[in-house]
């Protein structure tokens, strides 16, 4: 199993960080978790593409995690030479999002169907809405979902990917909660979105302060990793993004609560998880 952070950014546009997206490469295909802005550009850099994604998993329906859904649908369809339906797995509401996106694309779809004689089918994604439990079991790859807590955004889910004795958890946006704790037990890697409470409180803008009550701080994520006994904590979706020279501050905040390896993600940060 191979883990690639395609996008380590947040809702705030950043010239160096694409929007939230994590690629897990397995023997059964590429699994994409969330699809923030620029995801296919980063996927190309990682040697993947829309057509290579077996399944797209959405942790929740905030715009920064779904911005490039339209690009994935379009590029998968327009670059395939036979019907190649996109599988999308996400919380309740995902069906409405995908249907609305495909409706929005109707004009462009019509243009391409008219222009390309060999393109005789329209994109038609297959959506599965989930709350908890096993959501995929194919070729030795097991994906499990559990509810997380990003209230007032409801519902939200985290995902665990197991293959060959190794396990990765993609938390999405959440505060510490029992669902995430259960998902993480015995995992090798936890990919967790985080904010810097101290910096946000120092800035003091009301709209920015609002993010504190539904995101985990660096310390929160570290404590979650410690409770579960994971080996590696990957910090991503960092708000505000680390400025040059401050990276060690983030690592130190996590290390105060977690004794394992801490990785401060950048776009295309890669972790290899060979079979034990």
Where are these regions (language model features)?
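Binuclear metal-dependent hydrolase catalytic cores
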Residues: 1-169, 251-276
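Cap/insert and terminal regions of metallo-dependent hydrolase folds
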Residues: 158, 167, 175-268
């Amino acid at each position: 199993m191979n883990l690639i952070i395609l996008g380590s950014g947040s809702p705030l546009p950043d010239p160096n960080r694409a929007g939230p997206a994590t690629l897990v490469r397995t023997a059964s295909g590429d699994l994409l978790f969330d699809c923030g802005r620029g995801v296919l550009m980063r996927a190309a850099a990682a040697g993947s593409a829309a057509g290579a994604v077996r399944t797209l998993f959405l942790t929740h329906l905030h715009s920064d995690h779904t911005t490039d859904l339209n690009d994935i649908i379009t590029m998968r369809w327009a670059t395939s030479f036979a019907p190649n339906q996109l599988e999308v797995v996400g919380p309740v509401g995902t069906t409405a999002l995908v249907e609305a996106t495909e409706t929005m694309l109707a004009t462009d779809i019509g243009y391409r169907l008219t222009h390309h004689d060999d393109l005789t089918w329209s994109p038609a994604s297959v959506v599965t809405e989930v709350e908890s439990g096993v959501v995929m079991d194919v070729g030795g790859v097991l994906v499990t979902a559990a509810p997380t807590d990003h209230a007032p955004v409801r519902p939200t889910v985290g995902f665990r990917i197991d293959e060959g004795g190794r396990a990765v958890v993609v938390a999405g946006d959440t505060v510490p909660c029992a669902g995430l704790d259960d998902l993480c037990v015995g995992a090798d890697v936890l990919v967790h979105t985080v904010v810097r409470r101290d910096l946000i409180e120092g800035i003091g803008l009301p709209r920015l302060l609002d993010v504190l009550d539904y995101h985990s701080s660096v310390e929160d994520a570290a404590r979650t990793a410690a409770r579960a006994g994971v080996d590696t904590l990957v910090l991503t979706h960092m708000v505000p993004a680390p400025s040059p020279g401050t990276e060690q501050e983030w690592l130190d905040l996590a290390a105060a609560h977690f004794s394992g390896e801490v990785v401060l993600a950048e776009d295309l940060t890669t972790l290899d998880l060979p079979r034990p």
